[in-house]
From Swiss-Prot:
Short name of one Pfam family: Homeobox_KN
Cell compartments where the protein resides: Nucleus
Comp. bias (Polar residues): 28-46, 159-172
Lineage, opening ranks: Eukaryota, Metazoa, Chordata, Craniata, Vertebrata
Gene3D superfamilies registered for this protein in UniProt: Homeodomain-like (1.10.10.60)
Function noted in UniProt: May have a transcription role in testis.
Species: Macaca mulatta (Rhesus macaque)
Name this protein carries in UniProt: Homeobox protein TGIF2LX
Biological-process GO terms, alphabetical: negative regulation of transcription by RNA polymerase II
Location, primary (coarse class): nucleus
GO cellular component assignments: nucleus
Amino acid sequence: MEAAADGPAETRSRVEKDSRRAIKDSPAKTQSPAQDTSIMLRNNADTGKVPALPEHKKKRKGYSPAESVKILRDWMYKHRFRAYPSEAEKRMLSKKTNLSLSQISNWFINARRRILPDMLQRRGNDPIVGHKTGKDAHATHLRSTDASVPAKSGPRGSDNVQSLPLRSSPKGQMSGEKIPEPGSAPSQKLTMIAQPKKKVKVSNITSLSSPEPVSTEEYADFSSFQLLVDAAVQRAAELELEKKQESNP
């Protein structure tokens, strides 16, 4: 058992010694990166460690070429209302862009979230030129609104000024009131303006008030009617007494 256990340890030590001798004997200038990596792989295979690749050989996250992206953007803009290419269309785009089907599918998945909403808001025919975003778009929007407000509000104000005398004149004609002359006293103007206000107040109070109470005259009429009934009853009793007296002399 001890001899079997010492066997692998001796072989590992021999391999490490041989590799060290080979590295020392070979000149450093003549060694290529491939030879270095092969030696590292051999040493790590013997020791059971995973090799670490050099930094210049690490795979970087690649991006699609600009020409391929332009072709895909053009296709998406033309079909922006149905940006779901079929399998045949994906194969056609892969031939034009020299990209794989998986790359095209991934590009469309990301583009539908990031690029398509901006494309749907455009009105032109250029899929590359985008709208202004951020502070520039907000500033242009404010300028456009400020410029459009006076243009819209100007004629409306003049129409309101011209329509005021037309609306106020029929009231005086229908009510029969005379329009005061420009040289009249200001007190007359105030009284004429105050009269409709008083009427409006009275009408509001009467409309919001409770039902009209019964006047006191109705109670007086009822009491007099009761008195008349009592007097008639007494008169009838007196007449009966008189008849009885006449019948019994």
